[in-house]
Design a protein with these regions (language model features):
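Alpha-helical transmembrane segments
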Residues: 58-80, 149-157
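Short membrane-interface loop/juxtamembrane segments of multi-pass integral membrane proteins
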Residues: 94-118
């Protein structure tokens, strides 16, 4: 399962890079659209691989839990990552405008950090929902305990992210 997760992560970035190369360095707009549309399908491949493994009698492991984390993060942050890469590629290869940068100071920075934390919460909820589906597919809560083991460290990370993100609300960075 770990190999599938790594393959999907590589696939995400390869499809994104190819889509941007084709978009900005060739006249093949249709191919570019197809490649960029295929980027989120990597999540579907990962989800299908995990489901097939569990339905086929595979043991529910922490790697299935990592697959759920990957899917949650990809759904919550994927469009933002694609936009980030697109802005930089357009600027570098198509003489587009300079990429937008998040605010570094003041209330705008605090608002940005809070928004990113809420996006992190969305990723966590999606990951938990995927784990819930995996648990239902296995049909035995005792066999799926290793799946849920990934949620505790993730909750700690989410808590640390909360403290850092919301600290800027109480004490904004000064310019």
């Amino acid at each position: 399962m770990i190999a599938v997760i790594i393959g999907c992560e590589i696939g995400f970035w390869v499809l994104l890079l190819l889509g941007l190369v084709v978009r900005y360095l060739t006249p093949a707009r249709g191919l570019s659209k197809a490649l960029l549309i295929a980027v989120p399908l990597v999540d579907v491949v990962l989800l299908a691989a995990a489901v097939l493994d569990l339905r086929g009698g595979g043991h529910a492991t922490a790697s299935h839990g990592l697959a759920a984390i990957y899917i949650g993060v990809s759904v919550a942050f994927g469009s933002q990552m694609i936009r980030w890469a697109d802005e930089r590629f357009a600027h570098r290869f198509a003489h587009g405008p300079a990429p937008t940068r998040p605010p570094k100071t003041g209330r705008a920075h605090a608002a940005h950090e809070r928004a990113q934390w809420f996006r992190h919460v969305l990723a966590y909820v999606i990951g938990a929902a995927v784990l819930g589906v995996f648990t239902l597919l296995v049909g035995d809560i005792h066999r799926t305990v290793p799946l849920w083991g990934v949620m505790v460290p993730w909750a700690v990370i989410l808590g640390i992210d909360f403290v850092i993100s919301f600290s800027y609300t109480l004490s904004p960075r000064r310019s």
